[in-house]
């Protein structure tokens, strides 16, 4: 395992370039050329890119063999989407009664080890958690994020949305849950949470992390309370939130916004240097408390 690096080890301009690269706004060559101008050469730029790539051994906060949980891969129908989908489910071990559900929605690269660990973290907090893999129609997460991003870019976004709706309904109707289901998502997945809040009147609660705001004309349809988590340095995503916030307020929606100053987009993902331990821990604690408040009782 390589030495853990922190966001402060890199110039902010490098982190902005990396954000553009991993979200498809620039390609690898553009990143390396831009980084070379910042760090003084192509060899150094390549080393920077390698240092920013995820190290998934860092993600295991709740091991798969943790005695508090039971985990398995499941399939479920998506009749209006891709047909049959696959996901990773974790439940509290020895639960004698149904628990609330949490749908965990991945970033723009499929169901990677970080998201699987997030699923286990919610199960360890006494929820039934499901992390679907949007890449199921293309064979599933391929084992690395670069290929995962390329695969997810091939998928039709409208079809993917139907697959997320199907996952919500599968979890809502599962014998292990109470029927009360919240959704948490990161990056692309945060945007999906916002869209599900518009789409699903029975969504119990939504916690989007640094995800795109939905179309404002859908805001009147939102019924679920929202806890919006934003990174203070995330100029790209944050630019869409003033109007979203105004629309939520104007329509009397229940929501809170937490901005983690000094944190970068992706701060919850503990496999890359953009991880901010303090912000991630606080955001996770807030999310669990939020779901406890709105999904139990």
PLM feature segments, named:
Residues 1-30:
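N-terminal secretory signal peptides
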Residues 19, 28-53:
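N-terminal export signals
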Residues 58-95:
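N-terminal cap/lid segment of alpha/beta-hydrolase-fold proteins
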Residues 98-107:
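Short beta-strand element of the alpha/beta-hydrolase
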Residues 109, 135-158, 266-271:
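Cap/lid segment of the alpha/beta-hydrolase catalytic domain
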Residues 150-174:
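Alpha/beta-hydrolase active-site loop
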Residues 166-223:
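Primarily recognizes the serine-hydrolase "nucleophile elbow" in alpha/beta-hydrolase
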Residues 228-230:
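Short beta-strand/loop motif that positions the catalytic acidic residue
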């Amino acid at each position: 395992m390589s030495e853990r690096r922190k966001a402060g080890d890199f110039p902010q301009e490098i982190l902005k370039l990396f954000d553009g690269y991993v979200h498809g706004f620039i390609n690898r060559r553009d990143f390396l050329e831009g980084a070379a101008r910042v760090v003084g050469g192509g060899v150094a730029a390549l080393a920077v890119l390698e240092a920013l790539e995820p190290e998934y051994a860092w993600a295991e906060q709740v091991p798969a063999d943790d005695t508090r949980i039971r985990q398995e891969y499941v399939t479920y129908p998506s009749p209006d989407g891709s047909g049959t989908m696959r996901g990773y489910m974790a439940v509290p071990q020895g639960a004698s009664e149904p628990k609330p559900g949490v749908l965990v929605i991945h970033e723009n690269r499929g169901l990677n080890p970080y998201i699987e660990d997030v699923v286990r973290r919610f199960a360890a907090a006494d929820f039934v958690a499901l992390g679907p893999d949007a890449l199921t129609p293309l064979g599933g997460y391929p084992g690395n994020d670069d290929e995962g991003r390329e695969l997810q870019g091939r998928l039709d976004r409208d079809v993917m949305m139907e697959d997320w709706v199907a996952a919500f309904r599968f979890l809502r109707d599962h014998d292990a849950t109470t029927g009360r289901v919240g959704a948490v998502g990161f990056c692309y997945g945060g945007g999906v949470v916002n869209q599900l809040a518009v789409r699903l009147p029975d969504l119990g609660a939504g916690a989007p992390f640094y995800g795109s705001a939905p179309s404002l004309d859908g805001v009147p349809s939102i019924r679920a309370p929202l806890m919006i988590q934003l990174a203070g340095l995330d100029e790209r995503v944050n630019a869409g939130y003033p109007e979203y916030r105004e629309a939520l307020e104007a329509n009397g929606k229940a929501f809170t916004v937490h901005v983690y100053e000094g944190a970068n987009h992706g701060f919850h993902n503990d496999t890359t240097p953009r991880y901010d331990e303090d912000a991630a821990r606080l955001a996770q604690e807030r999310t669990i408390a939020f779901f406890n408040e709105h999904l139990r009782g």
